[in-house]
Amino acid sequence: MAKYLVIVESPAKVKTIKKFLGKNYEVAASNGHVRDLPKSQLGVDVEHDFEPKYITIRGKGDILANLRKEVKKADKVYLATDPDREGEAISWHLSKALKLEGKDVNRISFNEITQSAVKASLKQPRDIDMNLVNAQQARRILDRMVGYKISPLLWAKVKRGLSAGRVQSVALRIICDREEEINAFIPEEYWTLDAELKIAGEKKPLLAKFYGDSESKMNISSREEMDRVMAEISKETFKVIEVKKGERVKKAPLPFTTSTLQQEASKALNFPISKTMRIAQQLYEGVDVKGQGTVGLITYLRTDSVRISEEADAQAHEYIGKNYGENYLATQTTAKKSGAKIQDAHEAIRPSDINRTPAMVKDSLSRDQFRLYQLIWKRFAASRMASAVYETTNVKIGAGNYRFTVSASKIAFDGFMSVYTSEDDEKAENNVLLKSIDESTELSLEKLDEKQHFTQPPAHYTEASLVKTLEELGIGRPSTYSPTITTILARRYIVKENKNIYVTELGEVVNQIMKESFPSIVDEHFTANMESLLDSVGEGTVNWKTVIENFYPDLEKAVEAAEKDLEKVKIEDEVTDVVCDVCGRNMVVKYGPHGKFLACPGFPECRNTKPYLEKIGVKCLKCGKEIVLKKTKKGRKYYGCENNPECDFMSWSRPVEEKCPKCGGYMVMKGSKIVCADEQCGYVTEKKEKNQE
């Protein structure tokens, strides 16, 4: 009897796939990549056609030895690694490391780990796709070149252990740009006005929102203007001008891609992106389900496609018709593609079997596994269902030359919303008072309620919104979003507080160096174009070495220029007037994982360190002591009094010496302006040269 060997990446897959195949099949795991570029050198021969020098990864020798033994026993070898460019590269490296060239080697791939999918793949073996392999090689080599060439410059300029990366540096730049926008933002005053109107015969008042005059929408920006408008409105008679009843259709959502799953799990489940990917991997590779054994519950998790197979679509059609009714079936499923580049090699993320409902597997899953599976299941079911329909009522009310509006909506047909709603879905606003209102309805003013507001700065990025931005800009791919964010968090270039992402002092320094010395590396358009070229390599339309040949000379020139310019941007050890209380030397400023600190220059003989308090030359308005630049425990910068905790002064923006001439309060820097810290005051002036940082 012939013997067959199936090689996959993970032991979890081995357990799931083994039960699908007969006794003449052996299933073994490579535990991920087995070969890579050496860590101790560039690993690319730039003099000889950029040939990579691969070595066996440390710790993989025993795994390869065991695989070689299994290969000798097998008549046929199947390489069943993941169905993407990374998986294709692992299969190719295995074929080289195991010397399979003379063997009957077959590449198989499947989008879900189910018996039918695995057995179908065995009937359709193929050769290793060298276009995908070369796309992965090009990506790996480009990333190595950037990291290997630029990281030592960061070590020289800032501290050892820092890193630069082709995608991570752009992500950091995007976050820093948003932080600068927020810091430079100056709030602007605006007012809203609501009218409580009495309807004849009704106890409850109707709440109408001020719109403007008969010509256009009005924006009211001051107390004086609001008082004038209110005085004029108070004299007028209110009457219904127009009632419009209509219908609004809300389309079903698309099934999940990697990025939309990461975004929704972050918003709905409060999962960090790394956690979402870890749990999705478990659901894909297989979970022990009571009465069914090990089952792969979802399709492959790294995808930017919204395509659904005909079989899965038909299965969903049958399930929805049976459980919800024919009227809940989509007449045409939404099939939109978005983003700068879509790799449509896979399906969307969906349950491997829609009949395996969340309730059926709940007792077999951990709480987090269940919550993520339920989210995926509901989203997929919703994507195959009919649109929701809202009944809408919009009323226009006149008060002389001024206009107010009232709007309401209610769900007439819930459609897909019977299964799935997201945080972004609008809430129905059912105003029963609008049911009988028409142009003849008598209205009288009971009360005008004005409110002062101030515009808000752009929101800080969250992991979810950052992934959305990276995808929209075409930066990175489904497999890179999570490791990119994980890396810049681990390097402490950024920190997270209550989901929001903040740049640390270390992140600001690294970003500034990258912008000055390597502008193309942190340019989003350059990076997106490079991603597009790598996709073209995977499609076989661009030679992978041509991409590297075109990239490397410019990188070399930039590195050489940065090395020559090193002294201009290097952060030297700054000697302070703080005396080391151990040995008496003047302490110096150093960079650590959390930013600046004071260290004794007598290291290693003297290891004394102290927190670094950077004075900004401004006295505290509360107690007269110095204001210093501080950091929260997680690394966010703020300004506080050196006399803390006795004095509780604190500001996120940099204070200046001058007091506000309007209210006497303290003022802060906002971009090119100096503004009063009290929004109610609203005083703004141009920044003077001496106050510039």
Regions found by a protein language model. Give the residues of each.
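C-terminal or mid-to-C-terminal helical accessory/interaction module adjacent to the motor/catalytic core
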Residues: 116-195, 246
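Metal- or metallocofactor-binding catalytic centers and their adjacent structured scaffolds
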Residues: 216-254, 441
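Basic, low-complexity terminal or inter-domain segments flanking catalytic cores
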Residues: 2-5, 16, 25, 97, ...
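Conserved short loop/turn motifs at secondary-structure junctions
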Residues: 82-83, 159-163, 245-254, 266-272, ...
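Core structural elements
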Residues: 139-149, 167, 197-199, 248-260, ...
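Intrinsically disordered, low-complexity regulatory segments
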Residues: 1-140, 211-212, 220-223, 227
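Alpha-helical scaffold elements adjacent to nucleotide-binding pockets in ATP/GTP-utilizing enzyme cores
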Residues: 16-20, 66, 89-97, 117-121, ...
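Short acidic, hydrophobic short linear motifs in intrinsically disordered regions
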Residues: 240-243, 251-265, 292-301, 457-469
